[in-house]
Swiss-Prot record:
Protein name according to UniProt: DNA polymerase IV
Residue positions binding Mg(2+): 10, 105
Organism lineage: Bacteria, Pseudomonadati, Pseudomonadota, Gammaproteobacteria, Pseudomonadales
Subunit architecture: Monomer.
Predominant place of localization: cytoplasm
Amino acid sequence: MSLRKIIHVDCDCFYAAIEMRDDPRLAGRPMAVGGSPDHRGVIATCNYEARAYGVRSAMSSRHALKLCPDLLIVKPRFEAYREASREIHTIFRDYTELIEPLSLDEAYLDVSDSQWYSGSATRIAEDIRRRVARTLHITVSAGVAPNKFLAKIASDWRKPNGLFVITPNEVETFVAALPVARLHGVGKVTADKLTRLGIETCLHLREWSRLALVREFGSFGERLWGLARGIDERAVHNDSRRQSVSVENTYDTDLPDLASCLARLPELLDSLNERIARMDSSYRPDKPFVKVKFHDFSQTTMEQAGAGRDLESYRQLLGQAFARGGKPVRLLGVGVRLRDLRGAHEQLELFPPK
């Protein structure tokens, strides 16, 4: 089995965290993001105060209010969540391009070949958590392990706002005590069947031969045999093509005016050009853009087709973006949209010359 370094990052009650960040009045009271109880709405997520009452995701809003009469249910703002997710992925890409998103708030990262912190996956995970908290003012939990199966379990081990590491030497002991209900792919039906067979932990599961498990559970028995031993060879898949490359910085002190923002442009562009230089040849830089997040977390993005990637072009874009808010700035970003040359080539291949 190849030795890999996998991080699973999971935002803590993501939608609710964004709502509490943007409206501090929601913090400290039971709240949820979801649909109206009058229209058969469903809870998308809730904060930990609401979970203490038994409120859970996918529960009907009406039932949630019965459990917690003081529950405040707010409508989802998916664009705000998507934007936060994009910011988190921008942070991820500083450490690796091998990112497999599972949802807006959850992803696997393969940092096996990362040079950051001398290749320490634990320190990379710590840095990601620190940067997300500093930049987005929300918390994430992370798990570090030699494979995806264990990394996902690890990220849940010390939720919320926790980090748990399973080293290769700890795998056998850790997995042996693991309840089989925690195994990837084991739902209620399979868990109940395992219990009836007297299999409650992975140590019990190891007593069964591979053949016996296949006879009892079909092809899934093969996977159960491997998981009971901490084996999971699934790779971190990143099939999506990049749409842009960018760099951004959150400042410790808000930038008070346009002049102070413009003064930060050269260093941002230097970092952007370094990142562009590291891209593979299947991409070509296209439209430049700037991103401005104001002190109240409102934000805007300005881009222009046909503009250059020189300092003056970005100065003009930044001036237009700043004018939309005219308030102190907490974050500046610069980037460029990408043209996928590989995709264009493959599309042409579908229609060869006659």
